Curated annotation (Swiss-Prot):
Zn(2+) binds at C130, C133, C150, C153. This is Adenylate kinase. InterPro entries: Adenyl_kin_sub, Adenylat/UMP-CMP_kin, Adenylat_kinase_CS, Adenylate_kinase_lid-dom, ADK_active_lid_dom_sf, P-loop_NTPase. It is found in: Cytoplasm. Catalyzes the reversible transfer of the terminal phosphate group between ATP and AMP. Plays an important role in cellular energy homeostasis and in adenine nucleotide metabolism. Residues 30-59 are annotated as: NMP. GO terms for molecular function: adenylate kinase activity; ATP binding; zinc ion binding. SUPFAM superfamilies: Microbial and mitochondrial ADK, insert 'zinc finger' domain (SSF57774), P-loop containing nucleoside triphosphate hydrolases (SSF52540). It comes from the Bacteria. Belongs to the adenylate kinase family. AMP binds at T31, R36, Q57, L58, V59, G85, F86, P87, R88, Q92, R161, R172.
């Protein structure tokens, strides 16, 4: 089962991807992590990407797709994979489909988390994490049980991401609307797109994701 998660930044794609991975045994793939791993391993593709990044250039789609092809050939992807954060453009979507077709594979479903952008901005701006263990919290709906103390490790230091500031979030949402949102019709035309209310609580969203996945796997 090969899955793509789509949705604006902060919609909960990472959280739901991890839950999907745990339930169905399919590997979650972060293109950012994948890129860093190839560079660290000094593979041929990694060296090419490193040279581009050192020159201040973006890594082109064909290099990313080549890395992805190498990644999905790994044993942990035998049952399938989950893509979180890729593709981001229609060009990437087309390149991904072409690569998978060459391998005799395909995308089985595209899960789109729909959210209200104003509420989403509030949600993102409220995020903070434990500086010690990385446990996540939110000012709006998930504060530590004891104020100033991490529920998981008991730490007392918390951090907020610089790009979670409201003005930064607004810029990220604008970029998303211009770049990524237009690929929704592409997958809708393929009959792969499934829309999910991303504003529901996390467990409700997970239940809907599992419902969709179970229906597909039973076909």
């Amino acid at each position: 089962m090969n899955v793509i998660f789509l949705g604006p930044p902060g919609a909960g794609k990472g959280t739901q991807s991890k839950r999907l991975e745990a339930r169905y045994g399919i590997a979650q793939i972060s293109t950012g992590d994948m890129l860093r791993a190839e560079v660290a391993a000094e593979s041929a593709i990694g060296k090419q990407a490193r040279a581009l990044m050192d020159a201040g250039q973006l890594v082109p789609d064909d290099v990313i797709v080549a890395m992805l092809e190498s990644r999905i050939a790994q044993p942990d992807c035998a049952k399938g994979f989950i893509l979180d954060g890729f593709p981001r453009t229609q060009g990437q979507a087309v390149a991904l489909d072409s690569m998978l077709k060459r391998r005799g594979a395909r995308i089985d479903v595209v899960l789109f988390l729909e959210v209200d952008e104003e509420a989403l901005a509030d949600r993102i701006a409220g995020r903070f994490t434990c500086a010690t263990c990385g446990a996540g919290y939110n000012d709006l709906f998930k504060k530590p049980k004891v104020e100033g103390t991490c529920d998981v490790c008991g730490g007392h230091s918390f951090v907020r991401r610089e790009d979670d500031r409201r003005e930064t979030v607004a810029a990220r949402l604008v970029a998303y609307r211009k770049q990524t949102a237009p690929i929704l019709p592409y997958y809708e035309a393929e009959g792969l797109l499934r829309r999910i209310d991303g504003m529901a609580d996390i467990d409700t969203v997970t239940a809907k994701v599992f419902e969709i996945m179970d229906a597909i796997t039973k076909k």
